[in-house]
Amino acid sequence: MLFRNSLVFSVPLWIALKALKWHLLLNSYWKESSFSLALNSFLCGFSFGLITPGKVGELSRVLYLPFENRGDGIGLIILDRYCDLIALLFLAVFGVTHFAGFLYGFLVFLSGAIAASLFFLFPHLLELLCRQNKFASISNYMNHLRKIPPINSDVFFRVLVISFSCFVVSVATSFSLLLSFGDAPLSTALTVFPLTLLTNVLPITIGNLGVREGATIYLLGQYGLEKEVAFHVSILLFVLHSVIPALLGSIIQPFTRAGRKVKDSQLDRKATNI
């Protein structure tokens, strides 16, 4: 019963953390953004992301924002996913060290540190690229990025912490699922599940089906666990933290009025000009 309650609770907790992270990013650019707006935008975009390789469909989050310049939100989505990658790299250090050795674990840690530092170097790199780029189309895109107000370091670190927390919830949920099939040491969760989550960044299949299950079966097999158990744990986590949020997003899509609000504001402006 305890395992069942923790698994059920993990779904709204995971969704709330994801929406809170998105709200922090939105509020850093559009101060009038609310948590409910961020929640609706995240869930609707997530439902499209699930059916596209590499979750590219999550860029559709901006379609559910009631702002005329909502296209600027694409940069925020990229930053959101970038923070996820950094958090995963740090979380995967223990597993990489366990399976591949200290040197590879250190390289993964170093990669995470470099990726985090690039956030602070990005404005300077952008200025350099804008001055030296000879391709007009790319230069125009770079100039467009320069117009977007930079995210301050406080927001970046808070988003990074929430990203890390989301993955901790996923790892804890996976471990709870594993315990429902039998006993397993905590070290199993700390070494295996961050690595299986890291496969989500590979844009190979829709929903990453097959890749994640294969990685879970192989890694848990190193601890002598049966393939059937590993497969069921992977599929159940996919249902809890992917299918259910995507279904919720699909349900609320018809009731999302963001696009209509944008159109209404444009019509009001035209009427005022007339």
Describe the residue ranges of each PLM region.
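Predominantly cytoplasmic-facing regulatory/coupling regions of multi-pass membrane proteins
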Residues: 1-43, 97-201, 233-235, 239-274
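Extended non-transmembrane interhelical loops and adjacent amphipathic helices
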Residues: 39-67
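Transmembrane alpha-helix interface/packing and boundary motifs in multi-pass membrane proteins
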Residues: 47-53, 194-213
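Hydrophobic alpha-helical transmembrane segments of ABC transporter permease domains
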Residues: 78-100
